Amino acid sequence: MSEQSAPSPTPAAELSSDPASPLPQEIASALKRDSSGLVAAIVQQHDTNEVLMLGWMDDEALHRTMTSGRVTFYSRSRQEYWRKGDTSGHVQFVKSVALDCDGDALLIRVDQIGAACHTGTRTCFDGRDFTVVTGHRE
């Protein structure tokens, strides 16, 4: 189920080494992409700090996200772009984009409308907590 139809996707691996990256040079050069040319994108609700989901972006998806006000991901399984909410109505409006200290993960802060998860839940991290030994400060 593709949430965005135009334009046809370029394989992410091609974009990672493309000197004509749509991103400003200082951003493109700071990204540490995986072997497929992708960077993890953690999506967080801007006003509550709730972690909503994890998606993947290549240079083009990040460019679209930074210039449209809506979050676009690159689907690893379908190898195409999809903009969150185009078919479901569960839109993610961009509030900020940050790169982590290693350059291999993005934090996309959004205003989420409706469910963030494809299962229909607010967050993709609902109800799957593991039992752990918790640590305490001494």
UniProtKB/Swiss-Prot annotation:
Query: Where can this protein be found?
Result: Cytoplasm
What Pfam families is this protein classified in?
PRA-CH
Annotated Gene Ontology MF terms?
A: magnesium ion binding; phosphoribosyl-AMP cyclohydrolase activity; zinc ion binding
Give the pathway listed in the UniProt entry for this protein.
Amino-acid biosynthesis; L-histidine biosynthesis; L-histidine from 5-phospho-alpha-D-ribose 1-diphosphate: step 3/9
Q: Which domain of life is it from?
A: Bacteria
Swiss-Prot/TrEMBL cofactor(s): Mg(2+); Zn(2+)
Q: What is its EC number?
A: 3.5.4.19
Q: How is the cofactor bound?
A: Binds 1 Mg(2+) ion per subunit. Binds 1 zinc ion per subunit.
Q: How does it assemble?
A: Homodimer.
NCBIfam families recorded for this chain? PRK00051.1 (NF000768)
The free-text function statement in the UniProt record for this protein reads: Catalyzes the hydrolysis of the adenine ring of phosphoribosyl-AMP.
Q: What is this protein called?
A: Phosphoribosyl-AMP cyclohydrolase
Query: From which organism does this entry originate?
Result: Paenarthrobacter aurescens (strain TC1)
Gene that this polypeptide is encoded by: hisI
